């Protein structure tokens, strides 16, 4: 019997994320010397139905310290998992879910549970002398995702007047992931010059995800700026646009309307605005175009915005129960996968598989509060997701993921860059 995969030690600590807020880091060591560690991310605009991120609510770090979550790993989770075979990912995740005993992981904290879940997978992969993407995805993990790079920031990610949260570029015309990164990096620098020319050098400050946050006042102004940056870089034929509206952030529940550019807008009117944008600009994907509880509205938007990828983030929160409802109603046609929304690796994979089985595309995503941890890069390849969004080609916590994907592509030798096949990459 091979006991080298048995979990020997689990340890957690409080560290900082890219916004200067505390988060949980977990380390797992196996009897065979395999080592895995993970730093969990945190979102700024969060879905109401996400798994609970446990915070201490004390004076330290303005109430955001995570020492209780750290203690839950060191004093509760570790005691239950030491001696378990790290390869039994689903069993390990279920043990933690049962230990927590709540629907939303609010007892132990999704940040505690996820840190251990991912660190266990990494330790098992290291024990097996396999890269994480190959350990999770097997020999069929070969698709390099098309990156959605957030180069213009608004909403909760910036301090400007933009209602929409993310304006992204996706280099579908590249021949490889490395070339895709180059196209985006060159466009990013081109856009920087455009922003400086139009708004002054002081306007090239950046938001949480590395994108520029100039004093743009309207969505059309932002899209025109983006188009000019792409044209100057010379990639008008290779790069398309994707958006994250994060519409729940500018939805007024009292009136049942959206506040766009200071005016109240109905669901139908907002869908019409999207239609106009899609007709004028090379937009191929819109994330969270409507309020997170408006399944009917999502269904209508999916039908009326023909050919456009409608991505459910706050709508689904990587939860198979909500995803199942969306599938039955035809609400959106794509799942945004954020591991910390659901709290375990196995549940994240379940959501991805449900999406694929029902003809939905998949976008693996970071959060606005990130770290140098690059786990989602491996996960995107393991799942053959075809798409990843992890910020601008700037700031170390964003480039860590892109650099890891460059390494993976090099290591695979024979791989497929999703490119124009980003919706159905295999």
Curated annotation (Swiss-Prot):
GO terms for molecular function: magnesium ion binding; phosphopyruvate hydratase activity. Binds a second Mg(2+) ion via substrate during catalysis. Signal peptide: none annotated. Disulfide bonds: none annotated. It catalyses: (2R)-2-phosphoglycerate = phosphoenolpyruvate + H2O. This is Enolase. Its cofactor is Mg(2+). The active site is at residues 209, 338. GO terms for biological process: glycolytic process. Belongs to the enolase family. Keywords: Cytoplasm, Glycolysis, Lyase, Magnesium, Metal-binding, Secreted. It comes from the Archaea. Its main location: cytoplasm. InterPro entries: Enolase, Enolase-like_C_sf, Enolase-like_N, Enolase_C, Enolase_CS, Enolase_N.
């Amino acid at each position: 019997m091979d006991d080298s995969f048995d979990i020997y030690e689990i340890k957690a600590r409080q560290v900082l994320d890219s916004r200067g807020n505390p988060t949980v880091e977990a380390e797992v060591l196996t009897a065979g010397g395999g080592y895995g560690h993970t730093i969990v991310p945190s979102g700024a605009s969060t879905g109401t139905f996400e798994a609970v991120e446990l915070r201490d609510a004390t004076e330290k770090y303005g109430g955001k310290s995570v020492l209780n979550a750290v203690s839950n790993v060191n004093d509760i989770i570790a005691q239950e998992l030491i001696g378990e075979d790290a390869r039994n990912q689903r069993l390990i995740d279920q043990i933690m879910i049962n230990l927590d005993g709540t629907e939303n992981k609010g007892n132990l904290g999704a940040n505690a549970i996820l840190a251990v879940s991912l660190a266990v997978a990494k330790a098992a992969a290291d024990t097996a002398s396999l890269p994480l993407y190959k350990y999770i995805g097997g020999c069929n993990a070969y698709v390099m995702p098309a990156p959605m790079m957030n180069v213009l920031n608004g909403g909760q990610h910036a301090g400007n007047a933009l209602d929409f949260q993310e304006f992204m570029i996706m280099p579908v015309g590249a021949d490889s992931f490395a070339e895709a990164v180059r196209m985006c990096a060159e466009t990013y620098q081109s856009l920087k010059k455009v922003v400086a020319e139009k708004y002054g050098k002081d306007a090239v400050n950046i938001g949480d995800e590395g994108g520029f946050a100039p004093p743009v006042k309207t969505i059309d102004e932002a899209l025109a700026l983006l188009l000019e940056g792409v044209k100057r870089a010379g990639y008008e034929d290779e790069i398309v646009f994707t958006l994250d509206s994060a519409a729940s952030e500018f939805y007024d529940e009292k009136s049942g309307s959206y506040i766009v550019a200071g005016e109240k807008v109905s669901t139908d009117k907002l869908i019409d605005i999207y239609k106009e944008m899609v007709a004028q600009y090379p937009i191929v994907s819109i994330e969270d175009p409507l309020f997170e509880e408006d399944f009917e509205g999502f269904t209508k938007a999916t039908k009326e915005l023909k050919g456009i990828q409608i991505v459910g983030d706050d709508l689904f929160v990587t939860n198979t129960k909500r995803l199942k409802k969306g599938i039955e109603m035809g609400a959106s046609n794509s799942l945004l996968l954020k591991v910390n929304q659901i709290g375990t690796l196995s549940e994240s994979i379940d959501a991805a598989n449900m999406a694929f089985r029902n003809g939905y595309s998949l976008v693996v995503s970071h959060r606005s509060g990130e770290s140098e941890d690059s786990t989602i890069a491996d996960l995107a390849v393991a799942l053959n997701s075809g798409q990843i969004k992890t910020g601008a080609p700037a700031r170390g916590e964003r480039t860590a993921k892109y650099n890891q994907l460059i390494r993976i592509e090099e290591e695979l030798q024979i791989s497929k860059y999703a490119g124009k096949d980003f919706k159905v990459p295999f």
